């Protein structure tokens, strides 16, 4: 049996601890009120006789109290209760010592593998984790209702980002970068005016990204099309300066060539600034900013030609990669690139197909960019095309006072995720029981999400001036409440879910790709979506359905359920649950069928979704990859390619670092297994990860089959 401690950690059951606690109470009462060792053993035997695989400490103590009362040892029972209360006071005084000290000793494996883009060996990252442990502790003991904390500990739900809940900050956003560049902003009390050149605009953009990232805990996105006007400003400035310097001594063609050369130099330098700054900056969160660059060539854009040059340069530099410490070009994890397919660049003879061809080459080698189909997205979002907030979180359409759609300058309040497989396990194949329990768990999620929402209601704009006062989200006066931005759908708040495949297998005995399973899975998704829609109507808060990325959660839920319910074939035995609505990573299905199947769930999960296919090395078969990109444009809103992009620093091997039978990363050429001497980049959950993963996610990565 396993015991869940109050801090959420899980330890082996030890009956001697129960006996010792009763004996301590025994020593405090007169002889006639004491309990013999035989009767103490009998109480413990009754607890063990329940044969539960997993119990909370509180539940064990409740059973001890009941046992003492049943023995008519009321004085002893009272003394035990007082002892229990005093122990609780000690725990409330400090419950984080061991987790923090184990982190500093580099012995906290769970924390070290929680986020594949955080290196817990680095002092700045450790500081963030130490603060996070304190926040988790305060959240569990004080800030959340006890029943919410208990549901989280039992794996019924996951209250995301408890390590930041103690602070009045939110999840992710679409930075209103156009407004900040055009109208200026303020950082660290210093006025930043509108840039006069592309290079300066790129520098300011990276400064904004860093400042924003340090004041929220989730991802952010920047629409690169706002930089087009600054490239034109640079062109005009160069033309003016060169014309003056040459004093009419060059013809028009030569002047154009000289200007083009200067523009291309600045273009390359500016984009390089963004790429290197993002990959070398470390925010107060102890990591590089989780940022997405949105690459969308809009036909009605007055700076379309400039933006085409910018997008092309971003892709060229990503294709080249960034040098590691050994001087070898590798795949960087950030920034994430999202490239929009539209009629003029969907590989059907459009004007900008050449940029899409470059994007395909880049995806084949560096995994990014991911692809959004403007055609399909317009069908789901009232004719609009806009960036996800970070990885996959999408806003709902919202109109300002003038009736114009607005997406930039909006944000997500937070996420709570539902463990679908656990509901299936508890229902034991009984659909009536399943739907009843699902409704109960949804109510639990709603109440947990309202904790998220209520925590932000008292926030004033002074808490993060870059967000609330200087344009990233709004331009509120100092001291103004942000509460109005929490209502009316301006911001979203997300119900996440994980394990649609597993819950379908539990309830129907088949994958959700099977027709019978698909019908059930769609009904589950519709029920989740209806809950969000109903809550939105009842509260005027922007509830949205979100396919949880589950980088570490895929393992946490599966681990808890295995400990509680034992090994269940094809469910808890794998060591992980499947992300959101995705097809089981082990299931053999081709890329076209996978995208077609998953596209129907994207229409329901509009608060957050992304689909992927695993591909082999396609660098010498780009035509096949182009066919998939054409298919994406016509069939699915948001899609990505997973390939392998690794490097062994010991022998110079450039290919796939494998996961061996011991679940360890190993170079197939020289058998190097030292993770500090290899660069491994994998798709973790929409983002790329490069600092390795927990045991569950590693098993999931190892199990992935090719779809092309």
What are these model-predicted stretches?
Residues 1-107, 702-707:
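Charged, amphipathic alpha-helical regulatory modules used
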Residues 34, 55-58, 491, 515, ...:
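Short, solvent-exposed positions on alpha-helices
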Residues 86-90, 96-489, 510, 514-680:
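Conserved catalytic cores of very large enzyme subunits
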Residues 267-271, 275, 505-506, 697-703:
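Metallocofactor- and cofactor-centric catalytic cores in central/energy metabolism, strongly enriched
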Residues 477-478, 485, 489, 495-496, ...:
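Core of folded catalytic or high-affinity ligand/protein-binding domains
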Residues 493-506, 526, 683:
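Contiguous, well-ordered alpha-helical segments that form the cores/surfaces of helical PPI scaffolds
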Residues 671-708:
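Long insertion/accessory domains within large nucleic-acid-processing enzymes
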């Amino acid at each position: 049996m396993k015991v869940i401690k109050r801090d959420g950690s899980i330890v082996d059951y030890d009956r001697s601890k129960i006996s010792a606690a009763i004996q301590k109470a025994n020593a405090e009462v007169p002889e006639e009120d004491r309990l013999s060792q035989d009767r103490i053993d009998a109480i413990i035997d009754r607890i063990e006789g329940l044969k539960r695989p997993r119990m909370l400490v509180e539940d064990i103590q409740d059973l001890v109290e009941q046992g003492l009362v049943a023995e008519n040892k009321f004085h002893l029972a009272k003394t035990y209760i007082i002892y229990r209360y005093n122990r609780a006071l000690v725990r409330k005084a400090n419950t984080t010592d061991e987790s923090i000290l184990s982190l500093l000793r580099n012995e906290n494996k769970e924390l070290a593998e929680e986020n594949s883009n955080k290196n817990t060996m680095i002092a700045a990252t450790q500081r963030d984790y130490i603060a996070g442990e304190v926040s988790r502790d305060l959240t569990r003991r004080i800030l959340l209702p006890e029943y919410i904390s208990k549901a989280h500990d039992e794996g019924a739900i996951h209250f995301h980002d408890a390590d930041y809940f103690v602070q009045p900050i939110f999840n992710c956003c679409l930075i209103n970068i156009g407004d900040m560049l055009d109208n200026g902003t303020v950082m660290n009390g210093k006025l930043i005016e509108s840039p006069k050149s592309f290079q300066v605009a790129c520098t300011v953009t990276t400064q904004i990204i860093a400042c924003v990232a340090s004041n929220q805990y989730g991802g952010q996105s920047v629409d690169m099309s706002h930089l087009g006007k600054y490239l034109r400003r640079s062109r005009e400035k160069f033309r003016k300066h060169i014309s003056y310097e040459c004093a009419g001594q060059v013809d028009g063609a030569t002047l154009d060539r000289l200007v083009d050369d200067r523009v291309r130099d600045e273009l390359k330098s500016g984009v390089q600034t963004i790429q290197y700054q993002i990959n070398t900056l470390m925010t107060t969160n102890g990591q590089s900013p989780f940022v997405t660059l949105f690459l969308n060539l809009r036909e009605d854009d007055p700076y379309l030609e400039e933006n085409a040059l910018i997008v092309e340069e971003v892709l060229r530099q990503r294709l080249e990669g960034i040098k590691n410490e050994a001087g070898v070009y590798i795949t960087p994890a950030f920034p994430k690139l999202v490239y929009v397919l539209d009629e003029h660049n969907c590989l059907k003879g459009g004007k900008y197909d050449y940029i899409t061809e470059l994007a395909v080459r880049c995806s084949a080698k560096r995994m990014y960019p991911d692809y959004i189909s403007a055609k399909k997205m317009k069908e789901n979002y009232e004719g609009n095309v806009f960036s996800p907030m970070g990885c996959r979180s999408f806003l709902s359409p919202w109109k300002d006072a003038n009736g114009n759609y607005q997406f930039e300058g909006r944000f997500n309040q937070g996420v709570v995720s539902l463990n679908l497989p656990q509901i299936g396990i508890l229902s034991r194949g009984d659909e009536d029981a399943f739907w009843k329990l699902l409704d109960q768990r949804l109510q639990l999620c709603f109440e947990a999400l309202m904790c998220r929402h209520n925590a932000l209601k008292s926030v004033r704009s002074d808490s993060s001036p870059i967000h609330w006062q200087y344009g990233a989200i709004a331009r509120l006066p100092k001291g103004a409440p942000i509460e109005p931005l929490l209502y009316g759908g301006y911001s979203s708040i997300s119900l996440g879910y994980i394990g649609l495949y597993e819950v379908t297998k539990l309830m129907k005995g088949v994958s959700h790709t099977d027709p019978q399973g698909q019908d059930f899975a769609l009904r589950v998704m519709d029920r989740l979506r209806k809950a969000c829609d109903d809550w939105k109507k009842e509260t005027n808060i922007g509830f949205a359905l979100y396919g949880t990325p589950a980088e570490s959660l895929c393992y946490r839920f599966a681990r808890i359920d295995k400990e509680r319910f034992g090994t269940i074939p094809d469910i808890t035995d794998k060591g992980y649950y499947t992300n959101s609505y995705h097809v089981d990573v082990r299931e053999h299905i081709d890329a076209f069928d996978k995208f077609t199947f998953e596209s129907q769930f994207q229409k329901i999960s509009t608060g957050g979704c992304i689909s992927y296919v695993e591909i082999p090395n396609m660098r010498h078969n780009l035509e096949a990859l182009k066919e998939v990109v054409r298919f994406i444009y016509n069939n699915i809103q948001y899609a990505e390619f997973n390939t392998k992009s690794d490097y062994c620093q010991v022998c110079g091997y450039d290919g796939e670092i494998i996961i061996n039978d011991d679940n360890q990363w190993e170079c197939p050429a020289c058998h190097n297994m030292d993770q500090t001497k290899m660069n491994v980049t994998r798709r973790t959950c929409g983002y790329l990860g490069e600092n390795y993963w927990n045991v569950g996610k590693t098993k999931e990565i190892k199990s992935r089959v090719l779809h092309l």
